Curated annotation (Swiss-Prot):
Glycans are attached at N43. This is Ovomucoid. The record marks L16, E17 as: Reactive bond 3. Disulfide bonds join C6-C36, C14-C33, C22-C54. SMART domains: KAZAL. Avian ovomucoid consists of three homologous, tandem Kazal family inhibitory domains. The lineage of its organism: Eukaryota, Metazoa, Chordata, Craniata, Vertebrata.
Length: 54
């Protein structure tokens, strides 16, 4: 399984860096920061499906 380290999150602001990730909710996140913030908000229920757009 693929995973990302979200231990440094959440962060108050994310850059506009474009490196899409696909979440287990079938949503495409613009970059790791956006994805990790969502993971923290979901209390860990959101996971990484794969790198790239969904």
């Amino acid at each position: 399984a693929v995973s990302v380290d979200c231990s440094e999150y959440p962060k108050p602001a994310c850059t506009l860096e474009h490196r899409p990730l696909c979440g287990s909710d079938n949503k495409t996140y613009g970059n790791k920061c956006n994805f990790c913030n969502a993971v923290v908000e979901s209390n860990g229920t959101l996971t990484l499906s794969h790198f790239g757009k969904c």
